[in-house]
Curated annotation (Swiss-Prot):
Protein's recorded name: Glucose-6-phosphate isomerase
A GO biological-process term: glycolytic process
Pathway assigned to this chain's UniProt record: Carbohydrate degradation; glycolysis; D-glyceraldehyde 3-phosphate and glycerone phosphate from D-glucose: step 2/4
Active site, UniProt feature: E363 (proton donor), H394, K516
Alphabetic keyword roster: Cytoplasm, Gluconeogenesis, Glycolysis, Isomerase, Phosphoprotein
PANTHER family to which the protein is assigned, alphabetical: GLUCOSE-6-PHOSPHATE ISOMERASE (PTHR11469:SF1)
Function: In the cytoplasm, catalyzes the conversion of glucose-6-phosphate to fructose-6-phosphate, the second step in glycolysis, and the reverse reaction during gluconeogenesis.
Annotated NCBIfam families: PRK00179.1
Catalyzed reactions: alpha-D-glucose 6-phosphate = beta-D-fructose 6-phosphate
Sample GO molecular function, one term: carbohydrate derivative binding
Gene Ontology cellular component terms for the protein in this record: cytosol
Organism: Schizosaccharomyces pombe (strain 972 / ATCC 24843) (Fission yeast)
Amino acid sequence: MSFSLASTLPAWQAVQTHYESVGKHLVLKELFAKDSSRFEKFSFTFNGLKEEDGPILFDFSKNLITEETVELLVKLAKEANVEGLRDALFAGEHINFTEDRAVFHPALRNVSEKPMKVNGQDVMPGVRKVLRHMKEFSDAVRSGAWKGYTGKPIKSIVNVGIGGSDLGPVMVTEALKPYGQENLELHFVSNIDGTHLAEALKKCDPETTLFLIASKTFTTAETCTNAKSAKDWFLASAKDPSHVAKHFVALSTNEKEVTAFGISAQNMFEFSDWVGGRYSVWSAIGLSVALYIGYENFEAFLSGAHAMDEYFCSTPLEKNIPALAALISIWYSDFFGAQTHLVAPYDQYLHRFPAYLQQLSMESNGKAITRSGDMVNYTTGKILWGEPGTNSQHSFFQLIHQGTKLIPADFLIPIESHNPIDNNKHHRMLFSNFAAQTEALMLGKTPAEVKAEGTPDEIVPHKTFVGNRPSNSIIAKKITPASLGALIAFYEWVTFTEGAVWNINSFDQFGVELGKKLAKNVLAQLETKGDVENHDSSTNGLINLFKNGF
């Protein structure tokens, strides 16, 4: 059905009624006490991976839901036409209507032989051509066949990009560090703050450094400024501009700007305008990943995501893991009033995973206007944040356990560690904390339990835990290229489903434009003499302080 505001859908109103009569009164420990099979009812296993990579368990049982809750939320998804929008996406329709573009990143990881068409054209031959180019290049660099201008093999790779051209490659190369080539050192430069580039270059030798300049348009201000400074640093040693060709490659679609920079068109890795930045790690933007972990592992990374795509498209909503996770998230944000969502990976290699998911979720669904142009009257775009466990337990978990805010959480851990130190003792301790935290959040601790420990009466309230705090538990067999690909795709489809229900366009990002435009005006003023007076008094004061100093 066609609709503007999700809140006008009959199913939304049914969920609201259910929340008032049932949802807000649910007590998790009572639900578990009444139903010994609750874990089985609300846990789902993703079996789409090879034996060495999977399966992945998703346990939703520690959520403030009943079977009726799920039924009503699924009806909401159906009324909001989640399945129809999903099918339109995979059909190559221009569902990013504000930019008149298809949303076709699943084609980048389509490891099947099936064609995928946009505007009547099968895009797969072009996708495979770029992948072959990535394979040839990464194989040459990793083997030492690709030489720098003095004949030495590459030892350092510097990826220069920002946003999706940085967050994805950073996160994936960190997450898959056990698969990385030890004689290759990776650096990522994103911030326009000169410190970021300077610190990376301190560790590099111009003769053995390869720069990947990652910018779709090759006009992004931060990336182009960093790239020019990197080239200046390189030429200070190499002297001859022709040597740039051996040390700089471009991940871009703008051949004119790329060649003007001095990069050979043969060393340009293309991707299409239907690839959004936050979905671009699967594209040529993932070249740093392929260079570091090897093309075969990069291909496994793609295949894991493809397996989740196939699952999302073929599984009924009632049992569809990403769809259910999204609907439960909507249940908290729009009916319980939760504003944030915690992601706590109990795996040190995944320390950048929450930052990656921040962009995926918040840039996609940080919108207040529906697809039909109306202002929403409900909550969209949860604030997603997190840090790895167990570090996070010693910082912000206090607020989650005893604070005033409801903070739904995802806890993520692999069963197998890449580093089973001390006969796996470290990992057993890690898992014990993982399991205990979800249990503690659910159970809490009553005043009677605190008092029974001999706590003085006046201290009892301070040691009481309300409990009834919801969480999802996600347990992978092991973090491998394929399982990581599947997990990222899972969160992509969670984000998609949320946006579909809220009826917003999850695929543009006009919110990042205004500040960039104003920054150009401010920069021009910083490069002229005299005080500025054409802003508000605060902005004038800040600019003039920078120009004149204290």
